[in-house]
Regions:
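NAD(P)H dinucleotide-binding glycine-rich loop of Rossmann-like/cofactor-binding domains
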Residues: 78, 88-151
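Short glycine-centered segments of the SAM/dcSAM-binding site in methyltransferase folds
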Residues: 84, 146, 170, 236-237, ...
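C-terminal hydrophobic helical "lid"/dimerization subdomain
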Residues: 1, 274-326
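Short amphipathic alpha-helix with an adjacent loop that forms part of the alpha/beta core around
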Residues: 200-210
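Glycine-rich phosphate-binding loop and adjacent beta-alpha segment
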Residues: 223-292, 324-326
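Glycine-rich beta-strand-centered segment in the early N-terminal region that forms part
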Residues: 22-40, 49-91
Length: 326
């Protein structure tokens, strides 16, 4: 099979290799997927650059992908053969991810991709869409609640806006990119606030118009912790799926305790198969109804993996970067 791999950390154009490798064979409990698309996420490019040590002598990057099940290992339902699926956790604690023609992985890490939904879209779902669904729905239904979603110009947060709105919540969103405000409104937000201007707490209160804000979803949890605590109503929840700019914030425990607040973190790779399947079903249902837009910014051929990594590293994307493996 054709694949992209690296054997040391470093710049994409220096360490990524495009070439031939042996086709994988599904072990017991696994499926073999003929991949048509591979999604490039920030965690993939950070791992390649050296954010953590090499876990294996050779790594095929990327955890997200989409394709067709070609074979199954022992103990797996043979009726899965021929199914269109999207893939998660392709390179989580495993050497060989989705930047290849084939991947063999645990059957619990593939989810049905609805007919009519392209493989490129499927490859954009695993990490971003399941993170967003978990952030919105981990604690149960949100219909009638008012939710604050930070950084809604970003991929995960924009998906969270769509999921929360579709589930019946009122959504207030923030962005540091005012030019994307109309797009965030179109995704389902009732109000969009430029978090760089004015008093954020007051702006959220004005947008909420007396409604209690019960949930804050944030990719920079530590940076915004103080304002999130102030914004939230009693028994509210802060859901953090990142905290790069302030990784070790001071935690005002007593303030949180006297509001009975919950601080919840998400690492999508650690979702159990049943929980992930439940979120995947919600995402698939929204896709079928045309209620979810998993935006694609760029599709490149597999051999251009280095360019794809560079695009993700550059930041300021308005959608996913995908490698075509068809």
């Amino acid at each position: 099979m054709k694949a992209v791999w690296y054997e040391s950390n470093g710049p994409a154009d220096k360490v990524l290799v495009y070439g031939d490798m042996a086709d994988p064979v599904p072990a017991a409990g696994e499926v073999l997927v003929r991949l048509h698309a591979s999604g490039v996420n920030p965690s993939d490019v950070k791992a390649r650059a050296g954010s953590r040590p090499m876990g294996f002598p050779r790594v095929i990057p990327h955890s997200d992908g989409a394709g067709i099940v070609e074979a199954v290992g022992a103990g797996v339902d043979p009726s899965l053969v021929g199914s269109r699926v999207f893939v998660r956790n392709g390179q989580w604690r495993r050497a060989f991810g989705t930047a290849a023609d084939y991947i063999a992985l645990d059957a619990g890490c593939v989810h049905p991709l609805p007919d009519g939904i392209g493989f490129d879209t499927g490859a954009a779902l695993g990490i971003p869409a399941l993170t967003a669904a978990c952030a919105v729905l981990r604690d149960g239904p949100v219909a009638g609640e008012t939710i604050l979603v930070h950084g809604a110009g970003g991929t995960v947060a924009r998906l969270a806006v769509q999921i929360a709105a579709d589930c019946g919540a009122g959504v207030i969103a923030t962005t540091g990119r005012p030019e994307r405000a109309d797009d965030v409104m179109a995704a389902g937000a009732e109000a969009v606030i430029d978090y760089r201007s004015g008093n954020l707490v007051e702006a959220v209160a004005d947008a909420a118009a007396g409604r209690p804000v019960t949930r804050v979803i944030d990719s920079e949890c530590g940076l915004n912790l103080a304002s999130s605590i102030e914004i939230l109503a009693e028994k509210g929840v802060i859901v953090g799926y990142g905290s790069v700019l302030e990784p070790a914030p001071e935690l005002p425990f007593l303030t949180m305790m006297f509001k009975n607040l919950t601080l919840s973190s998400i690492l999508v790779y650690l979702l159990g198969d049943e929980e992930a399947a439940a979120y995947a079903a919600i995402v698939s249902d929204m896709l079928e109804r045309g209620a979810l837009d998993a935006r694609i910014q760029k599709v490149l051929p597999l051999e251009d993996a280095a360019r794809a990594h560079e695009l993700v590293e550059a930041g300021d994307r308005a959608g996913a970067v995908i490698l075509s493996t068809a």
